[in-house]
């Protein structure tokens, strides 16, 4: 058998859900700056040793992982406009080491709304959800 035929596709480095991308798009629209991208990063600190951070960034560094999500623009009615919007998630190489295989999602329920990171590399997490140990 051909060695190339035996290769299985590798799982995505990071998953950026449609719910998260739609929320980011809405926040970018509120800022009225189409050049903004969402950057997710890891810093030292928090209850468990590391914590997640989010910020908007116009700059894309040459070594950033860039995950693009195409979204159909929504209008006020039930259907879409047919126009597409591109939302970008940026991760620096150091943070990517801790986020490999993670999912960036956005969740709304009766207790509130927040971005959620489901990280398979987190050995323990804090009750606040923004701190973890690797």
From Swiss-Prot:
What does the cofactor field's note say?
Binds 1 iron-sulfur cluster per subunit.
> Alphabetically, which GO biological process terms does the record hold?
iron-sulfur cluster assembly
Provide GO CC annotations from the record.
cytosol
**Which keywords appear in this protein's UniProt record, sorted alphabetically?**
Iron, Iron-sulfur, Metal-binding
The entry lists its GO molecular-function terms as:
2 iron, 2 sulfur cluster binding; 4 iron, 4 sulfur cluster binding; iron ion binding
Quick check: keyword Methyltransferase in the entry? no
Q: Kindly give the InterPro entries that the UniProt entry links to this protein.
A: FeS_biogenesis (IPR000361), FeS_cluster_insertion (IPR016092), FeS_cluster_insertion_CS (IPR017870), FeS_cluster_insertion_RrpA (IPR023063), HesB-like_dom_sf (IPR035903)
Give binding positions for iron-sulfur cluster: 47, 126, 128
Report whether RNA-binding shows up as a keyword of the record: no
Cofactor(s) needed for function? iron-sulfur cluster
Q: What does this protein do?
A: Required for insertion of 4Fe-4S clusters for at least IspG.
Subunit record text: Homodimer.
Family to which this protein belongs: Belongs to the HesB/IscA family.
Give the protein's recorded name: Iron-sulfur cluster insertion protein ErpA
**Organism this protein belongs to:** Coxiella burnetii (strain Dugway 5J108-111)
Q: Which gene encodes it?
A: erpA
